């Protein structure tokens, strides 16, 4: 979790989360090039450690000498990797602390944002969260979410809605999905 702000009047919380190595340990790999011309996959966790060396200083990784990036090193982190992302979220290991905050945010119907270096279409990230809710992954509870959304509408004096699908879609539309490498951004140094 990056930030949490509490609104005292109604006890509402707003959350911001990073995806990789914060909510989930995704198996998606960055593609590197060995001195033999072989492509070698590197985890995002390892990439955080080695990224300043890639292309600057050859180093040993997974039994290979890495000399730079592969031809399309972040292909699985962009729109070309959308279907892989949707499949990987079904089984990727959850990161205990931040994941429990994510579950709390969703089950309570709190607005959240996903800020990630990934370059997927924002709608892919939104569909991914919907899939996780419908799966009941890691404590996410569709019924608790719907109950919270109905209660929110009541507290805010909004027209009652009982269509669960509409409530969840409306909720996810209020949440924000910021893949900073979507379009023209670079996943190599997304903070730039």
Language-model regions, residue ranges each:
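Nuclease catalytic cores that cleave nucleic-acid phosphodiester bonds
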Residues: 191-192
């Amino acid at each position: 979790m990056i930030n949490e702000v509490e609104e005292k009047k109604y006890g509402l919380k707003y959350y911001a989360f990073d995806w990789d190595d914060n909510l989930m340990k995704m198996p998606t790999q960055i593609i590197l090039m060995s001195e033999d011309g072989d492509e070698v996959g590197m985890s995002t966790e390892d990439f955080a450690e080695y990224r300043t060396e890639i292309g600057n200083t050859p180093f040993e990784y997974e039994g290979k000498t890495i000399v730079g990036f592969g031809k399309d090193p972040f292909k699985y982190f962009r729109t070309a990797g959308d279907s892989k992302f949707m499949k990987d979220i079904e089984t990727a290991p959850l990161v205990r602390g931040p994941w429990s905050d994510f579950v709390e945010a969703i089950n309570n119907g709190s607005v959240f944002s996903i800020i990630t270096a990934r370059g997927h279409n924002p709608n892919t990230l939104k569909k991914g969260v919907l899939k996780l809710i419908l799966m009941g992954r890691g404590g996410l509870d569709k019924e608790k979410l719907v109950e919270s959304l109905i209660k929110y509408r009541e507290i805010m004096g909004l027209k009652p809605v009982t269509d669960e699908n509409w409530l969840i879609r409306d909720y996810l539309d209020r949440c924000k999905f910021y893949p900073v490498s979507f379009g023209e951004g670079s996943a190599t140094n997304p903070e730039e």
